[in-house]
């Protein structure tokens, strides 16, 4: 069968399926997501650089943790000249609020209550994505945004299909061995590690 769970590479399987069904030789894995430019402009509150922080995720074992995001923000010398969109769901609302309380609402906004159709406009307005593997990272990379994905128990295939995807994994870990059962310690990815990866984009 084409789709089987064991050793499944999601992107390659979907690519093969699409090529077969549409009878085409090469199906690109980069796409284009269109937005309403007027809706995007209406969201612009200031001229600060915009960063999406993907603090939410599908489960606790894939999250880097709100305290790490607070420390990362403070690591930037110019963080008061950056606006952070905190991408998360209702379950992470409290984590988002803790970040806002620490950093200040003039530099943070939670997207916990936004629809996906609205979230894509916030991403379009932003410069880069930093965060957990989440739907936001997939949308961001397909909108041409540099994405820095913190991988703790996410297989390689989830960040293997776009030139905009940049992986951050714990030192000494082979990305080919990371699976949904890896449950790597979030604190093995240091603040400095993430900062050094993204600083040239800030």
Task: Pin down the residues of each PLM region.
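Catalytic machinery of carbohydrate-active enzymes
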Residues: 1-202
């Amino acid at each position: 069968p084409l789709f089987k769970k064991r050793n499944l590479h999601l992107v390659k399987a979907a690519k093969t399926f699409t090529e077969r069904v549409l009878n085409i030789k090469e199906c690109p894995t980069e796409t284009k997501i269109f937005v309403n430019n007027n809706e995007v402009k209406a969201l612009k509150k200031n001229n600060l650089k915009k960063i999406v922080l993907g603090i939410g995720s599908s489960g606790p074992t894939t999250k880097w943790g709100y305290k790490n995001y607070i420390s990362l923000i403070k690591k930037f010398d110019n963080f008061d000249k950056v606006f952070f969109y905190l991408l998360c769901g209702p379950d992470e609302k409290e984590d988002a609020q803790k970040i806002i309380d620490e950093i200040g609402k003039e530099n943070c906004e939670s997207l916990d209550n936004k629809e996906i159709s609205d979230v894509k406009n916030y991403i379009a307005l932003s410069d880069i994505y930093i965060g957990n593997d989440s739907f936001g990272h997939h949308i961001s990379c397909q909108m041409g945004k540099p994405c820095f994905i913190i991988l703790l128990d996410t297989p390689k295939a989830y960040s293997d299909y776009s030139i905009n995807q940049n992986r951050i994994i714990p030192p000494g870990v082979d990305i080919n061995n990371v699976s949904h059962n890896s449950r790597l310690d979030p604190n093995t990815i240091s603040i400095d590690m993430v900062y050094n990866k993204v600083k040239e984009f800030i």
